[in-house]
Regions:
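Phosphate-binding site recognition
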Residues: 1-170
Protein backbone atom coordinates (compact mmCIF):
# COMPACT_ATOMS: atom_id res chain seq x y z
CA UNK A 1 0.00 0.00 0.00
CA UNK A 2 1.34 3.37 -0.99
CA UNK A 3 0.94 6.83 0.36
CA UNK A 4 -0.75 8.09 -2.83
CA UNK A 5 -0.74 5.14 -5.24
CA UNK A 6 -2.75 1.99 -4.54
CA UNK A 7 -3.62 3.33 -1.10
CA UNK A 8 -5.81 0.34 -0.28
CA UNK A 9 -9.31 0.01 1.12
CA UNK A 10 -8.72 0.66 4.83
CA UNK A 11 -10.33 4.11 4.62
CA UNK A 12 -13.60 2.72 3.26
CA UNK A 13 -13.46 -0.29 5.60
CA UNK A 14 -13.40 2.19 8.47
CA UNK A 15 -16.40 4.01 6.96
CA UNK A 16 -18.27 0.70 6.62
CA UNK A 17 -17.76 0.06 10.33
CA UNK A 18 -19.53 3.34 11.11
CA UNK A 19 -23.01 4.64 10.36
CA UNK A 20 -23.09 5.92 6.81
CA UNK A 21 -25.50 6.53 3.95
CA UNK A 22 -25.01 4.05 1.09
CA UNK A 23 -23.93 6.18 -1.87
CA UNK A 24 -22.34 3.32 -3.78
CA UNK A 25 -24.51 3.99 -6.84
CA UNK A 26 -22.04 6.81 -7.53
CA UNK A 27 -19.73 3.97 -8.61
CA UNK A 28 -22.27 2.93 -11.25
CA UNK A 29 -22.30 6.50 -12.58
CA UNK A 30 -18.49 6.52 -12.79
CA UNK A 31 -18.46 3.08 -14.44
CA UNK A 32 -20.85 4.35 -17.13
CA UNK A 33 -18.39 7.04 -18.22
CA UNK A 34 -15.16 5.07 -17.58
CA UNK A 35 -14.18 4.55 -21.22
CA UNK A 36 -15.84 7.63 -22.73
CA UNK A 37 -14.86 11.22 -23.46
CA UNK A 38 -16.71 12.14 -20.22
CA UNK A 39 -14.39 10.05 -18.03
CA UNK A 40 -12.73 13.06 -16.40
CA UNK A 41 -14.70 13.87 -13.27
CA UNK A 42 -14.55 16.60 -10.70
CA UNK A 43 -16.62 16.28 -7.55
CA UNK A 44 -17.29 19.62 -5.88
CA UNK A 45 -19.53 20.22 -2.91
CA UNK A 46 -19.56 22.42 0.14
CA UNK A 47 -17.79 21.28 3.28
CA UNK A 48 -19.29 18.32 5.14
CA UNK A 49 -21.10 16.86 2.10
CA UNK A 50 -19.24 13.53 2.09
CA UNK A 51 -16.59 14.09 -0.58
CA UNK A 52 -13.90 12.32 1.45
CA UNK A 53 -16.16 9.33 2.11
CA UNK A 54 -17.07 9.17 -1.60
CA UNK A 55 -13.41 9.23 -2.63
CA UNK A 56 -12.51 6.53 -0.07
CA UNK A 57 -15.36 4.44 -1.51
CA UNK A 58 -14.20 4.97 -5.11
CA UNK A 59 -10.62 4.16 -4.13
CA UNK A 60 -11.66 0.93 -2.39
CA UNK A 61 -13.75 -0.11 -5.39
CA UNK A 62 -11.19 0.56 -8.12
CA UNK A 63 -7.83 -0.02 -6.36
CA UNK A 64 -6.30 -3.04 -8.07
CA UNK A 65 -4.16 -4.59 -5.34
CA UNK A 66 -7.15 -4.76 -2.96
CA UNK A 67 -9.86 -7.35 -2.52
CA UNK A 68 -12.85 -5.18 -1.72
CA UNK A 69 -15.71 -7.46 -2.75
CA UNK A 70 -16.74 -8.19 0.84
CA UNK A 71 -16.85 -4.46 1.65
CA UNK A 72 -19.42 -3.87 -1.09
CA UNK A 73 -21.51 -7.04 -0.65
CA UNK A 74 -24.97 -6.00 0.51
CA UNK A 75 -24.54 -2.39 -0.65
CA UNK A 76 -26.51 -1.00 -3.59
CA UNK A 77 -23.69 -1.34 -6.13
CA UNK A 78 -23.45 -5.10 -5.50
CA UNK A 79 -26.87 -5.55 -7.11
CA UNK A 80 -25.75 -3.99 -10.42
CA UNK A 81 -25.04 -6.29 -13.36
CA UNK A 82 -21.60 -4.78 -13.92
CA UNK A 83 -20.58 -4.76 -10.24
CA UNK A 84 -17.52 -6.96 -10.83
CA UNK A 85 -16.46 -5.41 -14.15
CA UNK A 86 -14.21 -2.71 -12.66
CA UNK A 87 -13.95 -3.97 -9.06
CA UNK A 88 -10.27 -3.76 -8.05
CA UNK A 89 -9.17 -3.47 -11.70
CA UNK A 90 -7.37 -0.11 -11.75
CA UNK A 91 -4.30 1.55 -10.31
CA UNK A 92 -5.47 4.57 -8.35
CA UNK A 93 -3.70 7.78 -7.43
CA UNK A 94 -5.41 9.11 -4.32
CA UNK A 95 -4.87 12.73 -3.35
CA UNK A 96 -6.45 14.37 -0.37
CA UNK A 97 -5.74 18.01 -1.13
CA UNK A 98 -6.27 19.05 2.50
CA UNK A 99 -2.89 17.47 3.34
CA UNK A 100 -1.14 19.62 0.76
CA UNK A 101 -3.19 22.74 1.50
CA UNK A 102 -2.40 22.49 5.21
CA UNK A 103 1.30 22.26 4.44
CA UNK A 104 1.63 24.71 1.54
CA UNK A 105 -1.49 26.86 1.94
CA UNK A 106 -1.33 30.05 -0.07
CA UNK A 107 1.68 29.20 -2.21
CA UNK A 108 0.12 27.56 -5.29
CA UNK A 109 3.44 27.13 -7.09
CA UNK A 110 4.99 25.34 -4.12
CA UNK A 111 1.85 23.22 -3.67
CA UNK A 112 1.90 22.03 -7.30
CA UNK A 113 5.66 21.41 -7.17
CA UNK A 114 5.30 19.21 -4.06
CA UNK A 115 2.34 17.27 -5.47
CA UNK A 116 4.38 16.58 -8.61
CA UNK A 117 7.48 15.66 -6.61
CA UNK A 118 5.79 13.40 -4.05
CA UNK A 119 3.76 11.42 -6.58
CA UNK A 120 6.66 11.15 -9.05
CA UNK A 121 8.88 9.87 -6.25
CA UNK A 122 6.37 7.18 -5.32
CA UNK A 123 5.80 6.21 -8.96
CA UNK A 124 9.54 5.84 -9.53
CA UNK A 125 9.89 3.67 -6.43
CA UNK A 126 7.05 1.42 -7.64
CA UNK A 127 7.79 1.17 -11.34
CA UNK A 128 11.56 1.30 -11.42
CA UNK A 129 13.89 3.41 -13.48
CA UNK A 130 12.20 5.66 -15.99
CA UNK A 131 14.26 8.03 -18.10
CA UNK A 132 13.29 11.57 -17.19
CA UNK A 133 14.57 14.96 -18.25
CA UNK A 134 14.80 17.97 -15.97
CA UNK A 135 11.60 19.39 -17.48
CA UNK A 136 9.44 16.28 -16.99
CA UNK A 137 6.47 16.51 -14.65
CA UNK A 138 3.89 14.07 -13.30
CA UNK A 139 1.98 13.79 -16.59
CA UNK A 140 5.20 13.12 -18.52
CA UNK A 141 6.15 10.42 -16.03
CA UNK A 142 2.73 8.73 -16.23
CA UNK A 143 2.94 8.60 -20.02
CA UNK A 144 6.49 7.20 -19.88
CA UNK A 145 5.51 4.53 -17.36
CA UNK A 146 2.58 3.39 -19.48
CA UNK A 147 4.82 3.40 -22.59
CA UNK A 148 7.60 1.44 -20.90
CA UNK A 149 5.38 -1.09 -19.13
CA UNK A 150 2.75 -1.54 -21.81
CA UNK A 151 0.02 -0.39 -19.44
CA UNK A 152 0.62 -0.27 -15.71
CA UNK A 153 -2.97 -1.01 -14.78
CA UNK A 154 -3.42 -4.29 -16.62
CA UNK A 155 -4.02 -7.56 -14.80
CA UNK A 156 -5.12 -11.07 -15.74
CA UNK A 157 -8.63 -10.50 -14.40
CA UNK A 158 -8.94 -7.03 -15.92
CA UNK A 159 -6.85 -7.04 -19.11
CA UNK A 160 -8.77 -4.15 -20.62
CA UNK A 161 -8.21 -1.84 -17.68
CA UNK A 162 -6.90 1.64 -18.31
CA UNK A 163 -3.29 2.37 -17.32
CA UNK A 164 -3.89 4.66 -14.35
CA UNK A 165 -6.93 6.31 -12.84
CA UNK A 166 -6.75 9.39 -10.66
CA UNK A 167 -9.31 10.52 -8.10
CA UNK A 168 -8.78 13.83 -6.39
CA UNK A 169 -10.44 15.01 -3.21
CA UNK A 170 -10.28 18.56 -1.94
Amino acid sequence: MGRYINKGNDGFASVCNSKFVDKTMLIEEVNLVMDTENRFLCVTRARRFGKSVAVKMLNAYYDQPCDSKSLFNGLSISRCDDFLEHLNCHRVIYLDMTDFLTKYGGNDELLVRHINHDICEELLSLYGPVTMTGNDDLMDLLVKIVDQTGGVGRSERCPESIGLSAHVCS
